[in-house]
Structures are given as structure tokens and as C-alpha cells.
Amino acid sequence: MTTQKQHQQQHHLQSGQEKNKALTLIICVCGLYGTFLTWSILQERINTKPYGDNNEYFKAPIIINLIQALFASIIGFIYNYVTTTTTSTKTTTKTKTKTNSNPFSIFFTNGKQNCNVLKFMILISITSSIASPIGYKSLKHLDYLAYLLAKSCKLIPVMIVHFIFYQTKFPNYKYLVAGLVTLGVILFTMAHVTTKTKINDGNTLLGLTYLIGSMILDGLTNSTQDQLFKLPLENKLTSGKLMSLLNLFIFIWTSLYTIIFHKYEIDYTINFINNYPELLIDIIGFAICGAIGQVFIFIILEKFDSIILITATVTRKMLSMILSVILFGHHLSWEQWVGVGLVFGGIGLEAFIKFKQQSQQKMKIKSKVA
């Protein structure tokens, strides 16, 4: 009888844990959709749509990046404090010394690796600081949907950087995915080359140059970030520490660059906001949504399989494109729809193969245990 009761209690406990996990996943996915769909709409609104009766366009992308980094850093510090405090209450006093809630401690408590941590953090923040404004510059010459489509696949820039700097070889399916995505983006962009607006001058070649440069910098950022996480650190670099410190560095570099070389953008932004106060609401909303969205990404990565994050991210980007078409009146030709299909088909193929690989690994582990 005692054994049967123990089995029942264990079953109820597992059932409760599964329900809590499912509820957490639903909240995180809904949060991811809600924040990043809003973020995407505001991004297009700020960068490509006119304000006021005079139809003035906001042309200070560095300021957008500056404000986004500030809010992401603040929310990152809050997220880091909450997660480290929660973790500390569940650990012993011995472990508490290693779970330091001060994110700056990673620069002083890792012995010989202190310099490497600082070096990688500076490099990541610089490449990230440059990538975003260059990407926004491409919007002067390309449609927002082309920008969104190209940014939907992070595999290509990562492959380019690894090939150039590390001579890395990839599985054959990744070359197929990269080919499908590249073909899709080119088809989508070139099929709409004749269309231009006041904000889009139709100079597709220049726009693609900016976009490719931004994507390569994204790849360098992601690859260097991978190297940072591989460092043997005693005081581990958590997602909260990375988010808070990285965005703080981006804010510092962008502030210095703006003050030294683009001080006029500060005055321009202040005057623009005085004339069109709704811009300030849009930028703050954009920054907050992006920062909170990052937190949901980290929670999903920490508590669930990466395949769940990939699936949620891909479907979110598809919804972003659909919302952009509906809300901002984009008209896509059949060639562009084929391009969209190729891009998301390639991303979907990558997700499917990763899912199969994970399933096979789990089956092997189970067979070894049995």
C-alpha cells in the first residue's frame, strides 16, 4: 500500500510539474509573440513611415539604437538581479559565492580569463553597435519586408564568418538551407526593384551592400559570443549578465560616437520630438518591447529545448511579415511570395533536421540507459 501511495504521489507531482512547465511555455511564447510583433511594427513605423501633416521622416537611426541599448541594459540588470537572487535562495552558502548578482564581477573574479572576457565583450558590443545602424541605412534603399526577410535567417552570416575566420566546414544540409534563403531574398528584392517611396530611393545595390554588411557583423557578433561562452570561467557568464553588460557597452560606445561625430542627431531628434511627440512614444515602446522580448528568449532557452525557440522565432517572423503587409499596405507580386516561401522553407528545413537530430540523440541516450 505504501509503495502504491508513493507511486500516486510521484505521479501527481510529475503531473503538476508538467502542467506548470506547459503554462510557463505558453506564457513565454505568448510574451515572445506579443513583444516582438509589436517591436517589429514599431520598427517599421519609426524607420519608414512619415510623421505629422508635413509627412516628415525620422532620419536618426543611431538615436534609436542608443535608446534601445539603454532600456535593454536596465531591464537586463533587473533580470540578472531577479534570476541570481532566486537561484541563490535555492543553493548552499558555498555556491552563493559563485552566484554573484553583480554582473561586473565577471571582469575581476575569473583569474587569467578576466582579460579575455573583457576583450570579447568589447568586440561583441562594437560589432553589434555598428551592425544595427548599418542595417537601418539599408531601409533608405530597400523595402522593410526585404530587410525583415534577410534578417530572418542568422545561419548565413554565421556560416560566412566561420568560413572566413575559422575555415569551418558545415553539413551539406546547411549549404542547401543557405542557398534557399539567399535565392529567396534575392528574388524577393529584385522582383520589387522598380518600386520606390520617399524613404526608399530604389537603389537596390547600395541597399543590399548595407544589408549584407550588417548581416556579416551580426555573424561576427554571434560567433564571438559563442567563443565567449566557451571560456572556462569560475564565475559563470549568465544570460542576465550578458544582456545587461553587453547593452551597457553598446550604450557607451554609441553615446561616445554620437557626441563626437553625430551631435547634430541629438538636436535633430529633440526638435523632431517637439514637433511630433508620438515619435518618443514609438521609440520607447520599441525599446521596451525589444528588451522584454530578449528576456523571454533567455527564459525559453534556459527551460526548454532550443528547437522550441527556433519554432517560435520562425513563426513570429512570418507573422511579422503578414502584419506588415496588412497594416502598412504592402503589395507583393507572385515572385515575391515565391521568395518568401524559399526563405521560410529553408528555415523550416533547418528546424526540421535539428528536431530529427535531437530526437535521435534522445533515443540513443534512452537505449544506453535501458
UniProtKB/Swiss-Prot annotation:
Which GO terms of the molecular function aspect are on file? Answer: UDP-galactose transmembrane transporter activity; UDP-glucose transmembrane transporter activity
Q: Does the keyword Endoplasmic reticulum apply?
A: yes
Membrane topology label: Multi-pass membrane protein
What does the UniProt keyword field contain?
A: Endoplasmic reticulum, Membrane, Sugar transport, Transmembrane, Transmembrane helix, Transport
> Which domain of life does the protein's organism represent?
Eukaryota
- What Pfam families has UniProt attached to this entry? UAA
Q: Does the keyword Transport apply?
A: yes
Give all cystine bridges in this chain. Answer: none
Say what the protein does.
May be involved in specific transport of UDP-Gal from the cytosol to the Golgi lumen. Involved in the maintenance of optimal conditions for the folding of secretory pathway proteins in the endoplasmic reticulum.
The identity of this protein, by name, is: UDP-galactose transporter homolog 1
User: What organism is this sequence from?
Assistant: Candida albicans (strain SC5314 / ATCC MYA-2876)
Q: Give the taxonomic lineage as stored in the record.
A: Eukaryota, Fungi, Dikarya, Ascomycota, Saccharomycotina
